[in-house]
Swiss-Prot record:
Keyword annotations: Amino-acid biosynthesis, Histidine biosynthesis, Metal-binding, NAD, Oxidoreductase, Zinc
Entry keyword Metal-binding: yes
GO molecular function: histidinol dehydrogenase activity; NAD binding; zinc ion binding
Protein name listed in UniProt: Histidinol dehydrogenase
Organism: Rhodopirellula baltica (strain DSM 10527 / NCIMB 13988 / SH1)
Pathway: Amino-acid biosynthesis; L-histidine biosynthesis; L-histidine from 5-phospho-alpha-D-ribose 1-diphosphate: step 9/9
Family label: Belongs to the histidinol dehydrogenase family.
One record GO biological process: L-histidine biosynthetic process
Binding, Zn(2+): 291, 294, 392, 451
GO cellular component, one term: cytosol
Cofactors (names): Zn(2+)
InterPro entries referenced in this protein's UniProt entry, alphabetically: Ald_DH/histidinol_DH, Histidinol_DH_CS, Histidinol_DH_monofunct, Hstdl_DH
Amino acid sequence: MFRIVAVPEFSIQTVDARDPSSSEAAETLAALREKLSPRGDLVSPRGRELTLKVFGKALSPIEVVETICKDVQSQGTEALLRYTKSLDGAELTADTLRVPEEDLKAAHAVADPKLIETIGRIRDNIATFQSAILHRDVTITPRPGVSLTQRYVPIPRVGICVPGGAAAYPSTVMMTAIPAQVAGVDEIAVVAPPTPFGAYNTDMLATCHELGIKEVYRCGGAQAVAAMAYGCDALPAVDKIVGPGNLFVALAKKHVFGTVDIDSFAGPSEVIVIADESANAAFVASDLLAQAEHSPGSAILITWDESLLTSVQAELSRQLGELERGDLARDALSDFGALVLARDADHACELTDSFAPEHLQIETREPESLIAKIRHSGAAFLGHHTPVALGDYAAGPSHVLPTGGTCRWAAGLSANSFLRSGSVTQFDQSALSAIAQDVITVAEKEGLTAHARSISIRTE
């Protein structure tokens, strides 16, 4: 049920990119790409004030993260609790940091039965897809006496970051934990801010219990990432950290990479919608607003139909008044949104590849022909009846995706993200003798005579 909300007039930039010689259009699109690129220097006025209060001086976000990580690494639980108090306003102890199992059970008991039933169905969808794509061991015998295997082993212990600032995200628990469970991860630790939308949120805790997660900690931000990476008395170290978060979480994950593995360096959520004259303007506008309400969230329409662009602009204005978070979506559209007019479908695909968006939605008569021309997107949604929200909540692939143009080389989270691959090689004596001289020749050319000797000693 929608309600009418008073939203001030909004503006969204329109870009006519049809003229290849237009420097203005090229510069506008380049500036938008730069806005969406991973940055370590963008922080709100409130964030700057809090930094000054906690650290006693103005620090960049990167400097804040480096300080927090260093302190947690050297001081352990004491630093974790101190930063949880100063940054999140929660005074906890080593005993109250972890959510008791009784609280998880209690949250599950009072949760909306409809939510629990929904979690069950979504879990089946996610598990079905993730199981289907899971890597299996592969063994080949290229010649007699030789066995070559690529084996996959689940990462033993994983940490999951769940946001909890402006909203509760049980979907993030599902989209990270279920792929990990499908992969066979033994231990899963969830961290969430000590807020009403985080580790004190009934729906989030009930989701954890329904999925069999027993480790949930009331901490967030860079201090939680550092604790999971380095380990402390109250929170044992993990092997990999996944999940979304704010700028400080993203920078902290980047900082601890190498001590542990991470999924990606995530920024604001983003979508590009490619649409033609067959698209429903109301549908397109709703899809753009679905990303914009993340705030910050980027929403870009690329079309070669000028009348559709005009209709979508009108629909955005109308639908903003129906959204509870309409003011946030309006600001995001103003800062990170665009309506782009392309020359044709091929040009739209070129522009899309230049952004390498997190989400790509194609609302055209023949979406399959366009997706074949696009190389860079985290997740693609084809047709008029496949909104991104399906992928956010229920379809099966994980909604944890690379952003800020990193889809050019990074992949979204999946069950395979929680596997470590390794090879297993076995030769019998005859097979070794057949290849021995090749190994010896290369080893001697490199001056590694001990390598060569380890072969020849077995074949002489």
